[in-house]
């Protein structure tokens, strides 16, 4: 068992428990959705494992960091939905560019000028809704850039 502290109160969990479980326990105390944990003053994603003895607070979609995390998740959801619904042939070499925020939204476009028709947009929207309902975790991994250069360059 490990102990984590929220508002000075200890909570005990099994060794392999994620912050998400603690967030779910405490969510009724929050008006808005919990999207990040602050662990000993450092931001952590909810899918990370609880550290024994840590002091935890939570950020919701009402905080600046929470809004940024939420937007990043929505962009990743959009990218997955595009990959699932629009053929490789149709996408070609187009990449999605997220340029800036508009009010509470984001301005996104394809860098090579691809324009989706109304039916394709509906398919992407439906795919995003299905993915959201499936509630898949979004996990961030850091990969050393030296791993990118293990193969000889085509110019060699």
Regions found by a protein language model. Give the residues of each.
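Ubiquitin-like/PB1-type beta-grasp interaction modules and other compact soluble beta-rich domains
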Residues: 1-75, 80, 87, 91-105, ...
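Short acidic, glycine/serine/threonine-rich loops at helix termini
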Residues: 49, 70, 120-121, 151
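Short His/Asp/Glu-rich catalytic/ion-coordination signatures at enzyme active sites or charged loops
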Residues: 103-116
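Extended, well-ordered alpha-helical scaffold/bundle regions in very large, multi-domain proteins
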Residues: 114-124
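Conserved glycine-bearing catalytic or ligand-binding loops at nucleotide- and phosphate-handling centers
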Residues: 122-138
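Conserved small/polar residues in nucleotide/adenosyl-binding loops
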Residues: 149-156
């Amino acid at each position: 068992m490990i102990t984590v502290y929220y508002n000075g109160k200890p909570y005990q969990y099994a060794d392999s428990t994620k912050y998400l479980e603690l967030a779910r326990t405490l969510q009724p105390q929050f008006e808005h959705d919990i999207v990040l944990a602050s662990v000993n003053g450092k931001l952590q994603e909810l899918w990370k494992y609880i550290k024994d003895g840590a002091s935890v607070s939570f950020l919701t979609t009402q905080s600046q960091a929470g809004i940024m995390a939420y937007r990043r998740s929505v962009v990743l959801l959009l990218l997955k939905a595009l990959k699932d619904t629009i053929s490789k042939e149709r996408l070609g070499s187009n990449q999605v560019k997220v340029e800036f925020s508009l009010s509470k939204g984001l301005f996104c476009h394809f860098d090579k000028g691809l324009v989706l028709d109304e039916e394709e947009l509906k398919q992407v929207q439906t795919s995003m809704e299905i993915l959201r309902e499936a509630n898949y975790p979004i996990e961030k991994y850091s990969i050393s850039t030296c791993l990118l250069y293990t193969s000889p360059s085509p110019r060699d």
